[in-house]
């Protein structure tokens, strides 16, 4: 199926790989972003580039922008790394919920037939394990749940809306530092000779797989929440692979009880409060009850989505290795902009 798709946030990690997947299938792509780093020099030449800030656009401007396209991919953040001025709930309400709902509604009004929203796998766990109370505890997760509910509510018989529930992602974008260079590498650099980390693990995927999933969802006009993952991996295995690429040899990973790690979260939260900042995650609870647990998506669910979309989930290890090999390489050249949400 040849499609004409507008990707909001098309120069980010997931937007870039989605553009590649759509172009490989013969589709037309227009990318919208605030990118100022001359994306024409590295973005796929077949795609059209449009500079604009979706967060400040009116519904009318969005409708004008979407006109003539049959599909829209909403690949904008922010994600849970952002620590805005307190209260975090107000920030995520505006930047995650209201902006995405405004964009999806504008897409429907402009005649677009298919929308894919990139969400978070926290909504999957909030839905399947309600006893954990994730949305009730964490403003970021609450915003993701509301984003999903309100975007899906706009779907109709002739307008499909899918929300991809995306876990940890690995991959590269030209002219960008991997987000992991800022998020994880500095922490690992401080832990020598061993790495101390809580138990548990996470579902994960490659950016390329997310792009292919988005393409297939558009082609099949699917509506609903879709948990996207390729495999589950415990932190110990993940950190062994990452440290091997970062330091040339795997470091020993020592497991620290989750409740002990939670004490570190109290200090993090206090440091933010002193600065007048807030996190969308309540660090103490997050470290003890999320990061220290196995946030795994069942293999049956992973395989079911792959079969439904005609895709084959693969090993994420090659993407992890490429990502952290790049993290190691960036120390040898001038610093570039890190991958945005």
Task: Give the predicted meaning of each segment.
Residues 240-295:
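Terminal hydrophobic/aromatic helix or amphipathic segment near a protein terminus
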Residues 98-143, 162:
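Conserved Rossmann-fold NAD(P)-dependent oxidoreductase catalytic core, especially the SDR/UDP-sugar
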Residues 47-98:
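NAD(P)H-binding glycine-rich loop region in Rossmannoid oxidoreductase-like domains
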Residues 131-224, 229-231:
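Oxidoreductase cofactor-interface core, primarily capturing Rossmann-like NAD(P)-dependent enzymes
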Residues 8, 32, 75, 115-121, ...:
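SDR active-site strand-loop-helix element
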Residues 199-208, 226-245, 258-265, 314:
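Substrate-binding strand-loop-helix patch
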Residues 5-25:
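N-terminal Rossmann NAD(P)H-binding glycine-rich loop of SDR-like oxidoreductase domains
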Residues 295-341:
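Amphipathic terminal alpha-helices
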